[in-house]
Regions:
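Conserved helicase NTPase motor core
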Residues: 1, 5-10, 20, 39, ...
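Alpha-helix C-capping/helix-to-loop hinge sites
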Residues: 10, 58, 62, 85, ...
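Class I S-adenosyl-L-methionine
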Residues: 49-52, 56, 104, 161, ...
């Protein structure tokens, strides 16, 4: 029942963080906030569906229009509604399997056995993108035994970036990044996104990475954040 201002609720595992999100959404709607003006962000589709269902159990039809989604799904929906605004017109989204296939091809079958596998390369690439760390720092933290192969790994990742550009692909990390960049650099895009919401409710805030926070930070002056 706090007033309309940013809030961060700190709680340990098993303390009812999701229940708090449900209660907050129900309170806001009961207090007059239109349900479609609330966007809930969480980390799995299952939890997103569960939160909406639990709010509907409390409020019935008045919760119609409440939206809950993962960060990726939310960003994809924004891009699809305004692809030109995000510089993503005529791009295709690729999933993890597509990424693995590209890394397998670019790594090559005859590569040194010391070079990380396609799956490991994919994980290293994603970790660096989501944390903002350099390849050097990423390898030291996550794969020190592969550090001697840093130059080859860098070449594979540069080739992966080039292949995506050539084929007009967006992977899941690109989706977050392009939205975050536009929210930060384009007042028009930022205002367009912010105009759709009164509140952003973030579940499991402790699990957010720097890239996900870059999505929220530009909106903090126009949308009220409630993070648990």
């Amino acid at each position: 029942t706090i007033p309309r201002e940013h809030a961060l609720v700190l709680a340990g595992a098993g303390c009812g963080k999701t229940k708090t999100i449900v209660a907050r959404a129900a309170f806001l709607i009961s207090s007059g906030t239109p349900s479609h003006r609330i966007q809930i962000l969480t980390f799995t589709r299952r939890s997103a569906s569960e939160i909406v269902e639990r709010v509907r159990m409390h409020l019935g039809d008045s919760a119609e229009g409440l939206k809950a989604s993962t960060f990726h799904t939310w960003c994809i929906s924004l891009i699809r509604r305004a692809p030109a605004a995000f510089g993503c017109k005529d791009y295709s989204v690729i999933d993890r399997d597509d990424q693995l296939q590209l890394f397998k091809v670019l790594r090559g079958k005859k590569a040194s056995s010391q070079l990380p596998t396609a799956a490991q390369l994919c994980d290293l690439y994603s970790f660096a993108r989501n944390t903002g760390l350099t390849l050097d720092a990423t390898l030291k933290k996550n794969s020190p035994h592969s550090y001697s192969q840093k130059e080859q790994i860098a070449q594979v990742m540069l080739a992966y970036e080039a292949r995506k550009r050539d084929r007009r692909y967006l992977d899941y990390d690109d989706i977050l990044d392009v939205v975050a960049q536009q929210l930060s650099s384009s007042p028009n895009t930022r205002s367009w996104v912010a105009s759709q919401y009164d509140y952003l409710l973030v579940d499991e805030m402790q699990d957010t990475n720097p890239l996900q926070w870059k999505l929220l930070d530009p909106l903090k002056h126009q949308v009220t954040l409630f993070c648990v």
